[in-house]
Amino acid sequence: MEMMPQYDLSRLPENTALKQQTLPTQQLNLSASVVLSIFFITGGFCLSIGIILLLSAKSTKKIEINYTKTCANCAQLRENSSNFDKACNCSLPFYLPEKMEGDVYMYYKLYGFYQNLYQYILSRSNSQLVGKDIWDTTNCDPFQVSHNDTPIIPCGAIANSIFNDTITLSYNLNSSTQIEVPMLKSGLTWWTDKYVKFRNPRSSNFTSTFAGSSKPLHWAKPIYELDLDDPGNNGFLNEDFIVWMRTAAFPTFKKLYRRLKRVHAFAEGLPAGNYSLSISYNFPVTMFQGEKSIVLSTLTWIGGGGLFLGLTYTVTGALTLLASFAILTIHLMLKRSKLNFL
């Protein structure tokens, strides 16, 4: 007589739909009309958004002044690193054809400067930048210590190569009267950078705190003297320094330098007319065949006048609509051939 196997009933799964894997399911049945509707709606939406973004970007007013060749004498001087402490100034007049209404932003723009190199990005000390351990130079090769073996603060390749041109914008009221355009050096950074990623050490005397350290090789003054007039913009919290430390993804990039202070003759923006840029030329670009320029620009609700986002939406929408018409054509041809067969 054959023995029946014995089962431990306590180990059997509960008799529920979930445990027995008998939950009801629903399979989405996509018909040709549903697929075509999705494609047409998606394509129309992306194309509409793209056109809106492009029109908005086109509405920004912008002027770019390249001063690489205009300041050629200074550029030649800066090719020799031993001349880093020698002053060199140049002036660049230009004409603004249209009034720039509202908030106006000044950027510096670099061509051919690769901030996205892996070794360059890693060459920094986050412990220094948050004020936790200003003597930590572990990851700052090859700019860890100076020639006399004292730690560099701030260390690393990014800090060492900071953009250090000084730019002043002036407005020519007439042939004999020139006034300096008031600019703000605050409100240039991201909130997270200013209040999270960069902090000064807890000290009331930066001179004693940073005693025994060296400034980066090509800096004119140490980190604690970047802005003696504004303690909130000094040290690691200096906004020009913070803006530079946020590395760019592409070799051609622009970074915010100043904001227009809307007072007096500039309360409504920058009036059309003759201007001039006075530049203290310090940042070398000719040695790597680069260029640099100043950009004055207004903003819209989507930001600057970049066309990338608008073009992306427009191209995506156009391709989706083309695919929609192709699918529709194939569907009608197959439907007609099926009717002819019957």
Curated annotation (Swiss-Prot):
Q: Which Pfam families match?
A: CDC50 (PF03381)
Keyword set, alphabetical order? Glycoprotein, Membrane, Transmembrane, Transmembrane helix
Q: Which residues are glycosylated?
A: 66, 80, 89, 205
Topological domain ranges for the Cytoplasmic compartment: 1-33, 328-342
GO CC terms in record = membrane
Q: Which regions face the Extracellular side of the membrane?
A: 55-306
Localization of this protein? Membrane
What domain of life does the native source organism fall in?
Eukaryota
Instruction: Provide the free-text tissue specificity comment from this protein's UniProt record.
Output: Specifically expressed in testis.
| Keyword set includes Glycoprotein | yes
Q: Where are the transmembrane segments?
A: 34-54, 307-327
Q: How does it sit in the membrane?
A: Multi-pass membrane protein
Per the record, the similarity remark reads: Belongs to the CDC50/LEM3 family.
Tell me the protein's name.
Cell cycle control protein 50C
